[in-house]
């Protein structure tokens, strides 16, 4: 899980508009919110193909962070449900993002 998560964080480091416009902490915070929303969608048993629309409907982050949703969904949906229930994916994402 950590290996896949790190590769996703590296991919988001390339987000041109978001990374340059916002501070690193703010950007990582928004990315963590997206990860948390996807985790909650999984816990709410939203089907994987409907997650993007479901998460966008309740988005509280800037619109440009919606591009992260299709990249994060497989990361969350490939995890075992017990791991999704027990772990705080938003906090894990933010921690790894800030380390980059």
PLM features per residue range, with description:
Residues 17, 24-27, 93:
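Generic hydrophobic secondary-structure packing signal
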Residues 22-38:
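Short N-terminal segments immediately surrounding and downstream of signal-peptide cleavage
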């Amino acid at each position: 899980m950590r290996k896949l998560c790190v590769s996703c964080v590296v991919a988001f480091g390339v987000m041109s508009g978001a990374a340059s416009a916002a501070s690193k902490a703010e950007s990582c915070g928004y990315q963590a919110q997206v990860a948390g929303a996807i985790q909650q969608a999984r816990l709410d048993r939203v089907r994987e193909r409907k997650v993007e629309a479901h998460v966008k409907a309740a988005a509280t982050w800037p619109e440009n962070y919606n591009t992260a949703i299709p990249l994060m969904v497989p990361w969350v949906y490939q995890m075992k449900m017990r791991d999704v229930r027990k772990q705080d994916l938003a906090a894990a994402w933010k921690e790894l993002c800030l380390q980059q």
